[in-house]
A protein has these predicted regions:
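Hydrophobic "anchor" residues on beta-strands that sit immediately upstream
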Residues: 13-14
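Adenylate-forming
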Residues: 50-55, 121
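Short, hinge-like loop/turn segments at secondary-structure boundaries
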Residues: 31-35, 57, 212-215
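PLP-dependent aminotransferase class I/II
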Residues: 1-3, 10, 26, 62-256
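Conserved active-site segment immediately N-terminal to the catalytic lysine
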Residues: 17-51, 66, 100-103
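Short, conserved loop/helix-junction motifs that constitute active-site signature segments
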Residues: 7-8, 35
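Short beta-strand-to-turn element immediately C-terminal to the catalytic PLP-Schiff-base lysine
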Residues: 41-42, 55-61, 91-93
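A conserved catalytic-core signature of glycosyltransferases
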Residues: 44, 52-54, 106, 115-116
Length: 256
């Protein structure tokens, strides 16, 4: 983030931080999501906090907060920032609030969260320390079990000054003799769900708009061909993790 923020400061630009998969982790001593004007987090079903679908944005800028509240609610007048903002209002102020509730001051969207979705998400946030600790335990167990295959696999590790949220457990094939698709099919056949990494340059709409960008972004192109995810989440038991490790042992067999 440091180089990005330096560019933004020089050119007087706003920054939006894509923190989609990085809840509750730190970078250079600060929480991910606290560096920019706005940070975006996902609460999709597979993510660290899930409400089933959707996500959230955070900011410490009061003016942006008012705008964001309006945009998520069809562009309504942001007379309410919190649901109890009218508790101490005078009668004249209440009249103004009532008249403004259905006043639309900009084009907006229907991005509101239901109370049930919010309750599910808040319960997970309250339990975040336990849940994140278990993710880290699961990741450590996977790393210890898969390290013997490091001639074939690149295992995940946090960069200096950063932490890893382990929404998934990413792996990359570094042995030319091993085909990613072959390994993925082997794992899937044994009940281990996988997912390919999805660099933007590999998406059909980006290829349609910009053509083949592989030569300009060789790392993304390499990941597109060689990397994949396996699961790493708080509900995985040690037995589940050991089963995953055992399948890798069976696949690599005498290759190590």
């Amino acid at each position: 983030m440091t180089p990005i923020l330096e560019i933004a400061q020089r050119r007087n630009l706003r920054t939006i931080e894509d923190s989609c998969e990085a809840m509750f982790v730190n970078y250079e001593g600060r929480p991910v999501g606290s560096f920019s004007d706005v940070a975006c987090f996902s609460t999709y079903i597979a993510h660290i906090v899930t409400t089933g679908v959707g996500g959230l944005c955070t900011t410490n800028d009061p003016e942006l907060l008012v705008c964001m509240k309006s945009l998520m609610n069809h562009g309504r007048d942001s007379i309410y920032i919190r649901c109890d903002d009218d508790q101490q209002a005078k009668e004249s102020e209440l009249f103004q609030i009532a008249n403004s509730r259905f006043s639309f001051i900009r084009f907006g969207h229907s991005f509101r969260c239901t109370e049930m979705e919010a309750a599910i998400g808040l319960a997970q946030i309250e339990d975040r320390q336990t849940r994140m600790a278990r993710r880290q335990e699961a990741a450590n167990r996977l790393t210890n079990g898969l390290t013997p295959f490091s001639n074939h696999l690149q295992l995940p590790r946090a960069r200096q000054g950063g932490e890893h949220g382990f929404m998934f457990y990413p792996l990359a094939i570094i042995d030319p003799a091993v085909q990613r698709n072959d390994l993925v099919l082997f794992l899937e056949a044994r009940g281990i769900e996988t997912r390919y990494l999805l660099p933007l340059i590999s998406q059909p709409i980006y290829r349609k708009l910009f053509g083949n960008l592989d030569a300009q972004y060789p790392v993304a192109a390499w990941l597109n061909e060689n990397a994949f995810y396996i699961g790493c989440h708080p509900e995985m038991s040690d037995d589940d993790i050991d089963y995953v490790i055992e399948q890798f042992k069976q696949y690599f067999g005498g290759r190590t």
